[in-house]
């Protein structure tokens, strides 16, 4: 199949590089699709391939993506980063144009967010109606944030989220950014506690504010967690920053989500972690394996969220009247 043979769909191409690309209506539709009975979803990828390009290793993202494609009738093709040499052996634009000849959707976990932007731009400029989905970059992790939103809806109820608060303790990284965006779109307040030098950049706070949200920033974990309905944390050292491990352990001393810190949260508060978890560092074993932890529910929701997102980028919407 060549680009010329691709039939343009009757909807605009829906790239999702971060959660704000969905907008409020798109987010509502993706979550509704994610909550649908899988067998009720039409096989929108029947006879089609979906490219899964990974520059970084993955457990939850790869498995949830592959199974979501299969559930929608498609064929997932896993591509390791070294096979294409993104922006080294071949430009991101050329990689995107090539993969779009064979696949109806391109999903990529990349080292640099700019690679995704160049892929999406190249397809748009060429008039190729193939969406790009961010499976993780150094800037954002929208697929994780969708699973987080799904988990919060299940725990507290879809109609009871507005006005609740999520406290994020740790490095204000890609996970934090996407969580803050989805929280703003859901009407959930968000606080973040990070050591000096590891807090959110001003542009992230400005984006959250532009979406109608507000993020409270502090360097005191207890201040962030006090009265919060959900407490979220992530590893102190993200993939690709391993050489900073010792420095970060020192900087994040006192930022472990343990029983003492959790006692400051609301009585019905739950604990979230995007995994993998380093017990004894960013979270204690007692908490991550305890009764208030919903991390396995959260992990399971990666599949449901991905299924909803993949269906949405292919033009499927969900509303009171069903699918359309």
What feature does the model see in each segment?
Residues 268-269, 274-324:
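Adenosine-phosphate binding glycine-rich loop
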Residues 44-50, 161-164, 268:
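Phosphate-coordination loops involved in phosphoryl transfer and adenosine-cofactor binding
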Residues 115-137, 243-265, 291:
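A short, gly/pro- and small-residue-rich
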Residues 1-67:
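Positively charged, low-complexity intrinsically disordered leader regions
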Residues 55-67, 154-233:
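Glycine-rich phosphate/diphosphate-binding loop of Rossmann-like nucleotide-binding domains
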Residues 209-286:
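Rossmann-like adenosine-cofactor binding region
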Residues 45-153, 279:
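Phosphate/diphosphate ligand-binding glycine-rich loop within oxidoreductases
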